Amino acid sequence: MRVMVFFKGSEISEMTPTPEMLDAFKAMDVFTEELVKAGVFVAAAGLKPSAESKRVVFEGNKRTVIDGPFAEAREMVAGFSIWEVKDMDEALAWVARCPNTMPDRPGEIEIRPFYEAADLADFVTPEELATPRTGERGKLGVA
């Protein structure tokens, strides 16, 4: 099963990294190498601060662009990783080994499974399920 692991951010993670945070990032690099060696790692990236972001609000056919930063946001994503694991228990076991990139305050990680083709069986035809995806969607196994 594939999961996306969200590394939650905060107003602190939106700031320039401290020396302690940089040390924690080095520990995260070591952890990522462990994921690679175990065949679990698919992809990962850190995200720039919300000050460099945009949000698009959909209202019917209207689209409104809002510039960051998003100080009012209660939850921000600082980074993500995609893993291929046997089950949620394996994902939880890996998260238990993950370094805290914000060692001076509580951190939070959210694990969300991807939809697999079988999860969509009630919504698509058998022919659509049997048709392999091509391009980037095929590489990532996107349902």
Show where each model-derived region lies:
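Conserved, structured core segments of small domains
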Residues: 1-143
